Amino acid sequence: MWFLVFSIWIASGQLLPHISNVIEKELDQLEITELSREYINNKFPITQSSCVKNALGEFLEICMRKGFEFVDADLRVITAVRLSVCEFESSGLTNYPSECHEKRLGGIDTISCVNALESSPQWWTTYSGNYQNLPHICMENSLPFEKEQILELFLNITDMYSEFQRNIENYWKSFSSDLEINGKENIDMIQNLFNSLVNDLIQNHKMKDEELITEFDKMKAEFDIRFFNFTESFDNLNDEVNEDLSLIKSHLIETFRQVDSEYMAQLQKNKNSTDKAFNELESMSTYILDHQKTSMELIDSFFSDLIDLTRDKNLVISDELMQTQEETIHLIFQYNKLVHESVIPLLTDDLLPVVRGVSNSIVENLDNMNVELTSHLENVSQTIEVKFKALEKETDRSLLKAKEVESNLRNLNNLVSTSLKGLQTIVRLLTFLLKRQVVLVGILQIFLRKYISMNLYLYAIAVVVTALAGSKVGSWGSLLMKSFVTR
């Protein structure tokens, strides 16, 4: 750090003369104000003085800032007169009234000039037109006036910047002269400080090296002694941990075997019940099909017998009617009108009741057969529906049991995988701790600044490991019990 500061001071001391020469050369150039005014006059000819500009100067200032209504009547008259004079001079007319000359307008009353202009129609027309056009002139010349105001503001800023530049140049001259005077003294002082600092650093470095070598020799001797003690303790602890892990492993294997056998028995039992339910379902479906087939055969037989019986009765009735008709026709032809009148009522009274009785009996038989067939079909459909519902419930129950068995087996597999992973993690943790416990003892002694015996450290590690193993085994045992209770 001191070396960096020293280098900066040396570089600044070398650059000071060059900077001073550059500043002196720049001071000989033209000032910014003169250059700015020359540039503006070349690029903006509006800033150059003219007759119309001088005539409208005071009028436009009030008109643009406040409005045409705030312009005084006398100022309007003076402005119109000045514009008329500018128009006369620009057209080459020199014999306009002497009362209206520019040099006399500021010190005399404008009434005499207006009266003089009134004497000639041409003069009065020019004055009247300019007076009436003053509002339009205010609006038309607003942009040049604003430009002029902006340029004036720019020139004011340029003047201020030029003054600021001159102040900076004067300050820089005084600062550079003071810097050149004090530079050598500061460099000598920094050189002395740097030399003393380097000497102090060299002495401190030598002392620290000697202290570190002595401390390292002590730590090496203590490390050899503790490492020898640690190897003996580590062998004993390793044997104890291996025995504990062997016991835990054998216990877990036995537990897994018992759980596996119980789950296999439960699975076989559920499988048998499922097979039995499927067999019952199959036999029930076979019975229903046979019963349905028998019912359909009975219905076909019943309708066939009914049709045959109806056909026979219709044939008998038809034959009887034909015979009766033949006999009647024969009697009609034999006995003529008298016989006809006596026989027809007799036949009518005898045959109509017989025909009506036979028809009524046929209709009643058909209605009874329809009612009996409908009730029988309803009973058969209800029986089939009840048996199908029972069969569906048995099937759902069997599927639920199979899903429960599958879920229990999946949980058991996850539990076994988690247990094995936990054992592997504990073994890796023990190996890691046992390999690095010497370094941990050294770090603890450095932080606590106190000697810790190897026996005390190994006892603490044994307690922590036993607690971790016990908590893991306890959690696995509780998970196994919960799974058995749930099952």
Swiss-Prot record:
Glycosylated position list: N156, N229, N272, N379
Keyword Signal belongs to the record: yes
Cysteines engaged in disulfide bonds, as pairs: none
Domain of life: Eukaryota
Membrane topology recorded in Swiss-Prot or TrEMBL: Single-pass membrane protein
GO CC terms, sorted: endoplasmic reticulum membrane; nuclear membrane
Compartments, as annotated in UniProt: Endoplasmic reticulum membrane; Nucleus membrane
Keyword tRNA-binding: no
Protein's recorded name: Nuclear fusion protein KAR5
Native species: Kluyveromyces lactis (strain ATCC 8585 / CBS 2359 / DSM 70799 / NBRC 1267 / NRRL Y-1140 / WM37)
Gene: KAR5
